[in-house]
């Protein structure tokens, strides 16, 4: 990989990291919404949606971390 390609890859990794951070913030917000509900409301459809959304977003963050780590191994 030449210098220009490494620079491009570095920029892409930085963009992915920014996206990962934004998704992580969204996951935290969804989890906070769920946590701030009473126990009864946590069991409601909306409460369950908050919990599922947080979990799905956290899964996406984990996948992006894996992609970022893999790209970091490219020489």
Range-by-range predicted roles:
Residues 1-75:
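Long, low-complexity or tandemly repetitive, helically biased scaffold regions used
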């Amino acid at each position: 990989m030449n210098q220009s390609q490494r620079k491009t890859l570095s920029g892409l990794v930085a963009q992915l990291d920014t996206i990962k951070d934004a998704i992580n913030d969204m996951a935290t917000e969804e989890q906070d919404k769920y946590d701030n509900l009473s126990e009864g409301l946590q069991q409601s459809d909306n409460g369950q949606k908050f919990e599922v959304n947080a979990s799905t977003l956290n899964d996406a963050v984990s996948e992006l971390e894996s992609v970022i780590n893999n790209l970091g191994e490219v020489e």
